[in-house]
């Protein structure tokens, strides 16, 4: 009887789990955001070499690292851009983590959008500070080249940690899904 009871309990648990997964898949609760490969990064209009796995690309004030297909752009007291030009300081196409180096302040400014991104998720995190100053536009904006977004081409800005300051005439973040994930 004991073995029969244990077998019955195990079968019921498996049935409940299977039913739960079935219901979750019907309501799209089991799918995560598709990763969008990083295809382009520009800093102050200059195209950045996207490094191979385990490699880095480095300039004064920033480092772009590829860690098993996850790209991390670390800002280290980067002072870039100008309020006299509408060119974005950072342009991104694909998933990118913007890492704020501990105890540093990076200041980016533009007459137009400071950070312009296409599809993919821009994650901002770290223990530093990022100041975005725009004279006439939003600090972070999207440009999807006239394309519609779908499940294969998601777009979001994810704010995890760090100090983020927006100054200027425009809004902070425009035309984006914003995810807040505090530590």
Where are the model-predicted features located?
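A composition-driven surface/loop motif
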Residues: 5, 17, 21-183
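N-terminal Sec-pathway targeting helices
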Residues: 1-10
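Alpha-helical transmembrane segments
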Residues: 10-18
């Amino acid at each position: 009887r004991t073995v029969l009871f244990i077998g019955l309990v195990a079968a019921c648990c498996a049935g409940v789990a299977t039913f739960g997964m079935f219901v979750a898949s019907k309501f799209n609760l089991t799918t995560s955001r598709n990763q969008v490969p990083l295809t382009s990064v520009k800093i102050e209009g200059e195209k950045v070499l996207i490094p191979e796995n385990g490699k880095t690309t480095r300039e004064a004030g920033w480092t772009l690292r590829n860690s098993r297909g996850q790209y991390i752009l670390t800002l280290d007291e980067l002072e870039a851009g100008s309020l006299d030009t509408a060119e974005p300081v950072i342009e991104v196409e694909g998933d990118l983590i913007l890492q704020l180096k501990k105890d540093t302040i990076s200041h980016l400014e533009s007459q137009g959008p400071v950070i312009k991104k296409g599809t993919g998720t821009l994650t901002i995190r770290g223990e530093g500070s990022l100041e975005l100053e725009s004279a006439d536009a939003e600090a972070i904006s999207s440009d999807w080249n006239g394309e519609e977004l779908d499940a294969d081409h998601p777009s979001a800005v994810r704010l995890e940690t760090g100090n983020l300051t927006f100054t200027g005439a425009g809004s902070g973040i425009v035309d984006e899904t914003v995810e807040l994930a505090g530590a």
